[in-house]
């Protein structure tokens, strides 16, 4: 690897060239000053970063010892006293309210879906950014949200019966979201603007209006025959597209060709769990796509059938407001960026001692440099109109680590000439020590926090690893019914509201991991806004459009106001450890648990290691496609490691299961010409060996994280490929 030495840093030449020739021009940043400040950041804060990781290990060792002596806690008072004694559970200070300023309404006041996408993949990133608006007709027609039964099957051509059910569903949605003062939307025959109001003519010839006229936001085209009508509910917009020249519009009595919903209000462009970025080559790709998003010039050639086209960021949507003025609605999702956490280092840059630098420090400096194209002195203000950069920080353990992230942001702001607190922080509440100290974590970032989120997947992985020595854990599928998890979900909302996040920040809920099961999502995920969350994660733009309907039905602000008087969830419930009271499962139940975990691990790891794909839809043992990333991998690997440690299964049984399920995964990937089977070459397959490492060496992984094994094995494969 060629390196450029500058200010005590040894920087990969490709990364250095990217920074100087691509990222810096147009920002007003002087390269000499940038690298000097970057070096100071690395050498001043690197030792602090490493010390925080040592503290994690020290606390884990004390927990391991306690559990070996006592097992799962029964006397919760004694257990809490121990956690306080070792500095795991910290004193809670006085009440306060966050004071985060200059927050865009998409985060502060608008409730709606949130996408998380690997920024390493330009097509996914563009699709997500453009998912601010989505066709309700397409989302319903193309998914199981509309049943295939009784002649309404999806096929290659248009099925009018299915289309009729889509239209009926959408009209029912309009009746609920923007009811008419009389009549129903299904009976509309024409729409027009008269004065500053929307007039709807019904099939019986009667004219009606909106029951709440203020819901009419604007239109495009001619007032007497508009091409679009824009309505508003709970801060979200709906565009009714009128076009009788299209097949759908021609068959519709009112000429309605589609209903477009404001969908993914925010999107996290992810540099972390959904990407596989292990070296400078990978990091440059991550940063280059983020640069394209911030400059607005990211594009990707997309092939559909025999045609190709260029996908770019969508422009804003321009309308005439109800009062006659110009109405501009954002055409793109507000973008946050998720940096990596405090754990990993990256060989892209070495410090003056030759050590790999903490990747979180590198991400902070470089992603903020790139964000200057949007929020700097010469910035476009096309993403954040409020001049803020939104950084999600994952996998932090407690307030000391949050404070360290804040210190990092302060240093980066000074280096880049940004105003104080321009870098906002999203706190992933996905580690147990952060959960139990959440109020103090928020206090540490009270001038920056714009987001807290329950990442129940990683949080479950940490739950298992933290209490690894306490006993055999309950089955993975039973975790969602465990006492700790419901208390954790409620605690996050309770503490967030106590700290004044409402109106300043998002209180988020986790991912719907089954992208093909949209009917189930429509039925179940409404629970998230009902629980007081003003955002929740969805796996696709289509899912965002369907989930957006929930925020029309539920006024989250009203829900949050009602929850303020609720007693906070019980700490004792959160601290309860999900060990099996009587681990008396049958051999068949144990083997099925192993098979399911092994298949998920192998299906994800083989794509991560062999192809550098960090987020995959992996079929489970029942052939249901599940979105897998490092968080789901962490659960499965830690669960198998726990059962191995406590003698529920043997190492030989795990190896046999892995080998057998490798053949299943191979068969599921048989249609991929680039896929390398594992089953015929267990010893040679680096991916298979990585999967074994994650389980057989699961107890020794720091906090149960999968990154060290994945990075090492991916680098091993890349080195092997270069040598071939």
Curated annotation (Swiss-Prot):
Its main location: cytoplasm. Its cofactor is Mg(2+). Pfam families: MS_C (PF20659), MS_N (PF20656), MS_TIM-barrel (PF01274), MSG_insertion (PF20658). Pathway: Carbohydrate metabolism; glyoxylate cycle; (S)-malate from isocitrate: step 2/2. Mg(2+) binds at residues 430, 458. Glyoxylate binds at residues 338, 430, 455-458. Acetyl-CoA binds at residues 116, 123-124, 274, 311, 539. The modification Cysteine sulfenic acid (-SOH) is found at residue 615. The active site is at residues 338, 629. It comes from the Bacteria. Monomer. Involved in the glycolate utilization. Catalyzes the condensation and subsequent hydrolysis of acetyl-coenzyme A (acetyl-CoA) and glyoxylate to form malate and CoA. Belongs to the malate synthase family. GlcB subfamily. This is Malate synthase G.
């Amino acid at each position: 690897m060629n390196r450029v030495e500058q200010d005590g840093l040894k920087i990969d030449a490709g990364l250095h060239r990217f920074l100087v020739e691509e990222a810096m021009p147009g920002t007003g940043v002087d390269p000499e000053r940038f690298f000097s400040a970057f070096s100071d950041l690395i050498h001043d804060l690197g030792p602090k970063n490493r010390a925080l990781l040592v503290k994690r290990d020290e606390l884990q060792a004390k927990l391991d010892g306690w559990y070996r002596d006592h097992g799962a806690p029964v006397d919760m008072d004694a257990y809490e006293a121990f956690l306080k004694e070792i500095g795991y559970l910290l004193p809670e200070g006085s009440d306060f309210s966050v004071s985060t300023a200059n927050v865009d309404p998409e985060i502060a006041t608008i409730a709606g879906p949130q996408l998380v996408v690997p920024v390493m993949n330009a097509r996914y990133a563009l699709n997500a950014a453009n998912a601010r608006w989505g066709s309700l007709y397409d989302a319903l027609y193309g998914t199981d949200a509309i049943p295939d039964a009784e002649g309404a099957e999806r096929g290659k051509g248009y099925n009018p019966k299915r289309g009729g059910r889509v239209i009926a569903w959408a009209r029912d949605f309009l009746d609920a979201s923007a009811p008419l003062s009389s009549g129903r939307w299904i009976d509309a025959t024409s729409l027009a603007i008269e004065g500053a109001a929307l007039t709807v003519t019904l099939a019986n010839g009667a004219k009606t209006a909106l029951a709440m006229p203020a819901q009419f936001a604007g239109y495009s085209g001619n007032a007497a025959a508009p091409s679009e009508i824009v309505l508003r509910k709970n801060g979200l917009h709906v565009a009714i597209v009128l076009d009788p020249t299209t097949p759908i519009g021609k068959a519709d009595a009112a000429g309605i060709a589609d209903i477009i919903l404001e969908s993914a209000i925010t999107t996290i462009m992810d540099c972390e769990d959904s990407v596989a970025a292990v070296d400078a080559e990978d990091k440059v790709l991550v940063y280059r796509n983020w640069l394209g998003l911030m400059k607005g010039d990211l594009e990707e050639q997309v092939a559909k059938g025999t045609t190709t086209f260029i996908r770019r960021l969508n422009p804003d949507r321009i309308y005439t407001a109800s009062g006659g003025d110009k109405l501009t609605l954002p055409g793109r999702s507000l973008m946050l960026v998720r940096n990596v956490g405090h754990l990993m280092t990256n060989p892209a840059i070495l410090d003056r001692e030759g050590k790999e630098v903490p990747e979180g420090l590198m991400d902070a400096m470089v992603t903020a440099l790139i964000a200057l194209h949007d929020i700097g002195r010469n910035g476009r203000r096309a993403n954040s109109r409020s001049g803020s950069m939104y950084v999600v920080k994952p996998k932090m353990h407690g307030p000391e680590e949050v404070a360290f992230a804040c210190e990092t942001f302060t240093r980066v702001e000074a280096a880049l000439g940004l105003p104080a607190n321009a870098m906002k922080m999203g706190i992933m509440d996905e580690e147990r020590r952060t959960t139990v100290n959440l109020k103090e974590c928020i206090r540490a970032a009270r001038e920056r926090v714009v987001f807290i989120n329950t990442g129940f997947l990683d949080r479950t992985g940490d739950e298992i690893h933290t209490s690894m020595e306490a006993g055999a854990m309950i089955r993975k599928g039973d975790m969602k019914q465990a006492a700790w998890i419901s208390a954790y979900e409620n605690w996050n909302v309770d503490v967030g509201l106590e700290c004044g996040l409402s109106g300043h920040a998002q209180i988020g809920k986790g991912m719907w991991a089954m992208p093909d099961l949209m009917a189930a999502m429509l039925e179940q995920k409404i629970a998230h806004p009902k629980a007081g969350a003003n955002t929740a994660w969805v796996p696709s733009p289509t899912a965002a459009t369907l989930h957006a309907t929930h925020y029309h039905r539920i006024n989250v602000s009203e829900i949050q106001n009602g929850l303020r008087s609720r007693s906070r969830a019980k700490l004792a419930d959160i601290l309860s450890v999900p060990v099996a009271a009587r681990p008396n499962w049958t051999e068949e139940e144990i083997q099925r648990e192993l098979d399911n975990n092994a298949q998920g691990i192998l299906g994800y790891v083989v794509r991560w290691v062999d192809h550098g794909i960090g987020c995959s839809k992996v079929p489970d043992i029942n052939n249901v496609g599940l979105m897998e990333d490092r968080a789901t991998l962490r659960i499965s690997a830690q669960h198998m490691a726990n059962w191995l440690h406590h003698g529920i299964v043997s190492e030989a049984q795990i190896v046999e299961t892995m080998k057998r399920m490798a053949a299943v995964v191979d068969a599921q990937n048989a249609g991929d010409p680039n896929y390398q089977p594992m089953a015929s070459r267990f010893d040679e397959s680096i991916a298979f060996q990585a999967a074994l490492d994650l389980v057989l060496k699961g107890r020794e992984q720091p906090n149960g994280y999968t990154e060290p094994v994945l990075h090492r094995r991916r680098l091993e494969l890349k080195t092997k490929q270069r040598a071939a």
